[in-house]
Curated annotation (Swiss-Prot):
Similarity comment: family membership: Belongs to the class I-like SAM-binding methyltransferase superfamily. rRNA adenine N(6)-methyltransferase family. RsmA subfamily.
Catalytic activity: adenosine(1518)/adenosine(1519) in 16S rRNA + 4 S-adenosyl-L-methionine = N(6)-dimethyladenosine(1518)/N(6)-dimethyladenosine(1519) in 16S rRNA + 4 S-adenosyl-L-homocysteine + 4 H(+)
Compartmental location: Cytoplasm
Organism: Metamycoplasma arthritidis (strain 158L3-1)
Keyword annotations: Cytoplasm, Methyltransferase, RNA-binding, rRNA processing, S-adenosyl-L-methionine, Transferase
Taxonomic lineage: Bacteria, Bacillati, Mycoplasmatota, Mycoplasmoidales, Metamycoplasmataceae
Binding site for S-adenosyl-L-methionine: 12, 14, 38, 59, 83, 100
Pfam families on file: RrnaAD
Protein's UniProt name: Ribosomal RNA small subunit methyltransferase A
Enzyme class, UniProt record, top EC level: transferase
Length: 258
C-alpha cells in the first residue's frame, strides 16, 4: 500500500535509518510505557516496540492507521486513529513520549505535554531546529520566550543533534532537531497559575515588565518585587531567568496588598 505524505497533517517521513536508531538511543526506552505521536510509516515504532512494556501510537491519518494495523497484527502496539491533541491518558501509569511531531502544531503538543507533566517521565521529540533553539534559549536572546519558560518550568530540556532536511521525504524547508524533556516529579507552584503568570509577563514583549503586571497587581507591589529580584523598573520579561521569574511570582502572590 503506497502512502503519499499529506500536507494538511504536516507529514514529512524520516527515511534515514541511522538517524531513526539515534533517536531511539536518545529516548533510551527500557521496559516502559510509551506514547508515540504520529508513527507515520512506523519506522520508530518498529524499533520502540521491542524495548517497551506497552506502546500506544496516535495516528490521525486514516490511511496510515490502516497500513500500520496490517503491518503490526501480532505486536504489542495499540494504534489509535485520533488526533493526539484530543487524547486522554491512563493516569495510573507513568509514560515516556516519543515522536516526529507535526511542525504546524508543535506549540499545542508541547503545552499538552506540560499539562500532563505529572504522569510523564520523559519526552523525546523531533521539532524544527528553530523551535529547539527556543526551548534551550537563554535570557536576553531573541529566541527566549513564553514557550522557553513554560517548558523549562516542568522539566529539564536538552537539544541533542540537528537533522538535515534531506533526511526526510518529502524534504521540509527547514532543518530539524532532537530534543528531550526530563519531567520533574513535582513542581514548586500551581501549574495553571504559573502558566497564566508566564503568559501575562510575556504578553507584550516590547513592554516593560511592570506594564504587563500592573493590571493585576498594584504598581507599588510590582516595583518592589522587581527590585527584590535585583532588577530595575525598566526590565522586560525576556531579561529574567526562570528562577527569577519564579521568585517574582512568589513575591507577588505573597504580597500583602494583593
Amino acid at each position: 500500500m503506497e502512502v503519499i505524505a499529506k500536507k494538511r497533517f504536516g507529514q514529512n517521513f524520516l527515511i534515514n535509518k541511522a538517524i531513526q536508531k539515534a533517536i531511539v538511543d536518545v529516548a533510551c526506552v527500557d521496559d516502559e510505557n510509551v506514547i508515540e505521536i504520529g508513527p507515520g510509516l512506523g519506522a520508530l515504532t518498529d524499533l520502540i516496540k521491542e524495548l517497551s512494556k506497552e506502546l500506544i501510537a496516535y495516528e490521525i491519518d486514516n490511511d496510515l492507521f490502516k497500513k500500520l494495523l496490517v503491518e503490526n497484527q501480532n505486536s504489542n502496539v495499540r494504534f489509535i486513529n485520533e488526533d493526539f491533541l484530543n487524547a486522554t491518558f491512563d493516569e495510573k501509569k507513568e509514560w515516556v513520549v516519543i515522536g516526529n511531531i507535526p511542525y504546524n502544531i508543535t506549540s499545542e503538543i508541547l503545552f499538552k505535554l506540560i499539562e500532563n507533566h505529572s504522569i510523564l517521565k520523559k519526552a523525546t521529540l523531533m521539532v524544527q531546529d528553530e523551535v529547539a533553539n527556543r526551548l534551550v534559549a537563554m535570557p536576553k536572546t531573541k529566541e527566549y520566550s513564553k514557550l522557553t519558560v513554560s517548558v523549562n518550568f516542568v522539566g529539564n530540556v536538552k537539544k541533542h543533534f540537528v537533522v538535515k532536511a534531506s533526511n526526510f521525504n518529502p524534504a521540509p524547508k527547514v532543518d530539524s532537531a532532537i530534543i528531550t524533556i526530563d519531567f520533574y516529579k513535582s513542581l514548586p507552584y500551581n501549574l495553571k497559575k504559573v502558566l497564566a503568570f508566564i503568559k501575562q509577563i510575556f504578553a507584550f514583549k516590547r513592554k516593560m515588565l511592570i506594564n504587563n503586571l500592573v493590571p493585576q497587581w498594584p504598581k507599588a507591589d510590582v516595583i518592589w518585587a522587581i527590585e527584590q529580584i535585583g532588577h530595575k523598573q525598566t526590565t522586560r520579561a525576556e531579561e529574567l531567568s526562570l528562577q527569577e521569574i519564579m521568585k517574582l511570582y512568589e513575591i507577588l502572590v505573597n504580597s500583602k496588598s494583593n
